Design a protein with these regions (language model features):
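N-terminal glycine-rich phosphate-binding loop for ADP-containing cofactors
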Residues: 1-429, 438-471, 478-484, 490-492, ...
Length: 693
């Protein structure tokens, strides 16, 4: 079969002899132009191709995917000295555009870039546990979300990777780097070896550094090797630092802390930054590759050199010298030349150039002239070529009152100004978490139902205005797109979605129904999918939409979102999320060039009336009897069915959009007064998880 393909990826056992034998077999059957790559994470790339023809070696390289490949963006491309330049460029282009990867060209050195630096960081944490008296929980607190890294931090990450895998990686690195001045950090500590020998390998065996016992999370005592409940943290005023919203400010506050937290962080980060700098040019040609590798492969918000920038070049350099941490020669040289330094425009990290098919919002916003309008939670930006961008800046990109009012203001500007169209999007990891529940809860608790009613009318009117706006509006979405965020996207005439988009109408999870046009559009979707207006043909699609919303299903990808009805078949799906704003802008320009006209108003939507409502309610009853949903879920499902079948209509009828929007409003408002809905909202705000009461 591989004789017919253009790219062969090898991912067999990490044994050099086996890989070499396989490559000999592969060479005998592949096409003359086929690219061959190895996914090895530790073996020298050039040795795997040893003995192969010159033609084969020109088309051979390493392609190290990070697991799971679908969700981790990093792809390390590792050419050998024989790899043809055009092959490297072709693989970079293909992986970025069609696989959605962040591609970093690494050198053929032990464990390449991300695993070399990432393993070093984990081993630093292990040393602090065994030599400096910090607890597992303290180290994970100081190396997790507090400093812009995943919640798994150090020891949870080790457990997830597998302690046997971690030990294998460290043992693989250690003998392969005899000239690394810090190689002793990779020496496997007795605690790690003991855990592996006793079969405590982490998540895959149920215990490693952590162990879950019932609902309690225990951690290993490094002295007694007994799992114990977490002890109180002795990290001074760490809670105050955790509350600082900006990561750069948070890092600086932690770095300057005079207690145990600051002591740990300074030693940890100075060693990490020093080591990263000393690995240039051994493992990478510049700081950019290392930062990208750590952000894309390990999920760090800032790479090592971006952290250095945040803390201040001269501050970090002086502190390294004060504690005798070796400073890389290139850092010394450029520092002496005055190239970098606190308060200067230049930094230790030369910003990577943005590809032509991406839009860097940070660069765009650096020029004040590009900000056309703003409030504390949103802004209207000039993307150039007559296209504007409405950007959310609220917490979680929620649709707060300021965001909703700002969007209306943006449409006013767009309508009267010399603009060709609008993109709605942002650079966050998630497009929108939905409506601002905290604002809604405050209004409900105050008894100001009329204010909520007015807000719903405002939101519905805004969604309709977007849908029928005379100029093209394109949503550029990615990540989570929930509740009101989903309704906003469904209102946009055109959408550009990252493949990794998780979109859904999840309002039933907080005891409500979609109230900003989401139900109206799903009813319309069901009617449009049917072959005719016959209730018999519409019913299966309506049933599917009812189940999707009733179970608060979130699509697992943009492709599944099209199946669910959240995204239209015309949605443009991009594999690389970084391209979504650029592609959305191009869509605006294309639509405008083609003589854009808004979609026609829908004045004849077929709803199925009481017979269909009875069928939907019966389906909910079966779910309730089977123990799949609660009694209150069943009640909510009945209200959902009421709206989706046309309210009190007794027979299938044609209605307009306003009829369904009114049903949404009339059904939504009473639910806010229900105690169980208020419990669900309070629980979501407190725990970020739905309550099924």
């Amino acid at each position: 079969r591989i004789a017919d393909v253009d790219w062969v990826i090898e991912a067999v056992v990490e044994n050099l002899r086996i890989k070499q034998q396989l490559m000999a077999r592969v060479e005998s059957v592949i096409r003359d132009h086929a690219v061959v790559s190895t996914n090895t994470s530790g073996l020298p790339i050039h040795l795997i191709a040893q003995g192969r023809s010159e033609s084969f070696r020109k088309r051979f390289l390493g392609t190290h995917f990070f697991n799971p490949p679908r969700y981790l963006k990093l792809l390390e491309v590792i050419p050998t000295t024989d790899t043809a330049t055009e092959i490297i460029k072709r693989m970079q282009w293909f992986a970025r555009l069609h696989l959605g990867k962040g591609v970093v060209v690494a050198k053929d050195t032990p464990n390449f870039i991300a695993n070399r630096i990432g393993t070093y960081a984990i081993m630093l944490g292990l040393r602090a546990l065994t030599e400096h008296g910090y607890t597992i929980e303290e180290i994970d607190t100081l190396t997790g979300t507090l400093v812009g890294r995943p919640k798994s931090a150090t020891f949870r990450t080790a457990d997830l990777v597998g302690l046997d895998t971690l030990m294998y990686v460290a043992e693989n690195i250690y003998p392969a780097i005899p000239h690394d001045e810090s190689r002793e950090i990779f020496h496997v500590p007795p605690l790690l070896r003991k855990l592996v020998e006793t079969g405590s390998l982490g998540a895959k065996t149920g215990q490693g550094f952590y162990k879950k016992q019932g609902k309690e999370i225990l951690s290993i005592n490094p002295v007694t090797l007994v799992y114990e409940p977490a002890k109180p943290l002795h990290l001074g005023d760490i809670e105050a630092i955790e509350k600082i919203p900006d990561l750069g400010d948070r890092l600086r506050a932690l770095y300057q802390d005079k207690g145990r937290a600051g002591t740990f962080f300074r030693e940890f980060i100075l060693n990490l930054l020093g080591y990263s700098a000393r690995r240039i040019p051994e493992i990478a040609d510049s700081p950019i590759e290392i930062d990208q590798a750590m952000r894309w492969g390990f999920g760090w918000e800032l790479g090592p050199f971006e952290i250095w920038d945040a803390l201040g070049f001269e501050t970090v350099l002086a502190d390294m010298k004060a504690v005798d941490i070796p400073v890389a020669e290139w850092v010394k040289k450029d520092g002496e030349m005055g190239r970098w330094g606190d308060g200067r425009n230049e930094s230790i990290l030369m910003s990577p150039s943005t590809p032509l098919d991406e839009i860097n919002l940070a660069t765009l916003k650096a020029d004040p002239k590009n900000t056309l309008w703003q409030n504390p939670e949103a802004a209207l930006l000039d993307l150039g070529d007559g296209v504007a961008l409405y950007e959310f800046r609220s917490k979680g990109n929620t649709l707060s009152l300021k965001v909703v009012d700002g969007l209306a203001e943006a449409l006013d500007i767009l309508e009267t100004g010399d603009f060709r169209g609008l993109v709605i999007g942002n650079s966050g990891a998630n497009f929108s978490a939905g409506a601002n529940l905290a604002e809604m809860a405050m209004l409900a608790q105050s008894g100001n139902i009329q204010a909520i009613a007015n807000l719903i009318v405002k939101f519905q009117s805004l969604m309709q205005r977007i849908h029928y706006f005379p100029k093209p509006i394109v949503a550029a979405i990615n990540g989570r797109v929930l509740g009101g965020g989903c309704e906003l996207v469904m209102a946009c005439p055109q959408v550009v979605a990252a493949a990794e988009t998780y979109i859904g109408l999840v309002e039933l999870g907080v005891g409500l129904i979609p109230g900003a046009g989401g139900l109206m559009r799903m009813v319309t979707w069901a009617a449009d999918r049917a072959a005719t207006e016959s209730p018999h043909h519409i019913q299966p699609f309506l049933q599917k939409a009812f189940e999707t919303i009733g179970m608060a299903k979130v699509a697992n990808s943009a492709y599944e979102a099209q199946e669910f009805g959240y995204l239209a078949p015309t949605t443009k799906i991009v594999m690389n999320s970084d391209r979504r704003l650029y592609v959305a802008k191009e869509e605006v320009l294309r639509l405008e060039r083609e003589g854009y006209a808004p979609p026609p108003e829908r004045n004849a939507i077929m709803v199925l009336g009481r017979p269909a409502r009875a069928m939907l309610e019966h389906a909910a009853y079966i779910m309730y009897q089977g123990g799949y949903i609660s009694e209150y879920d069943r009640f909510l499902a009945s209200r959902l069915a009421y709206v989706m079948t046309g309210g009190e209509l007794t027979v299938p009828s044609l209605v307009d959009e306003n009829y369904l929007l009114q049903l949404e409003r009339e059904t939504f408002l009473p639910l806010l007064s229900q105690p169980k809905t208020q419990e669900r909202i309070a629980h979501m705000l407190k725990t970020k998880k739905p309550l099924r009461n």
